């Protein structure tokens, strides 16, 4: 994988999913599920970050979900506010280089959804004063509490 626009310090964080653990470069806002998608789907070799309008649309969906979850009492207001701020940053064009999964992938957009969830959750963690990957404070799954990936990208 070559993400030359992201400078690497050599520092990593350890993340895990149901398939096991993986070292993630500390500079990446995406996490283990995005890394697995990048490794597994080399179909078009065109990454999500070539389509900033899609990233902005995903940010709109995620922001709306965070607001609804906050209003329904499903998401802590401080976490929701950090997610909302992270989504506003995405709509302003920040962190586009972090959307690295292939535009064509298996499934129903799950990799796209998780790439967005991980980037937004990790930025929200920073806004809350935590380190990327400290998911006990804001987990990527918090961004999909009342929606699933299929409606975001068939």
List each language-model region with its residue ranges:
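Conserved, well-structured ligand/cofactor-binding cores
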Residues: 1-149
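Short "domain-exit" segments at the C-terminal end of structured domains
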Residues: 150-154
